[in-house]
């Protein structure tokens, strides 16, 4: 089973009890940066082994993680902050799981763009999310509308 686990985006206390429970019970945690995730795991005394899964190893590590999932191992996928699969390489493992009929479950939690949307004070019944703005200021012109 692949557990897609949202993690705090700033305050370590912004994590669900279910997320802590899952992170303690799985066989392995796949994370963008093991050093970053270790801070969260240490805070909650979670001793589960971790492995890195990031942009530059997503193909080789993805195949390794897929083999473990096919051996009925339970793996939690986390991002450095927020929800895996949103603007991070987690979508690659999620896609592999879907393609290979691996069961998945989602452990919801913080998502930065939802927080920004709510804090905008604007109506939230319709919105478009296009990811990160371009790095150059000139390219940002006309892209962000609130």
Residue ranges of model-derived segments:
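Beta-strand/loop-alpha-helix module characteristic of Rossmann-like adenine-cofactor folds
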Residues: 5, 115-143
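Short, acidic/small-residue loops that bind anionic groups at enzyme active sites
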Residues: 96-116, 127-133
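Short Gly/Thr/Asp-enriched flexible loops that form oxyanion-binding sites at enzyme active sites
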Residues: 85-100
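Glycine-rich, flexible N-terminal cofactor/catalytic loop recognition
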Residues: 1-55
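Short phosphate-binding loop-to-helix
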Residues: 55-70, 89
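Short glycine-rich anion-binding loops that position phosphate/pyrophosphate groups of nucleotides
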Residues: 9-10, 80-84
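Loop/turn-to-beta-strand initiation segments
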Residues: 1-2, 72-76
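Conserved helicase motor
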Residues: 51-60, 132-137
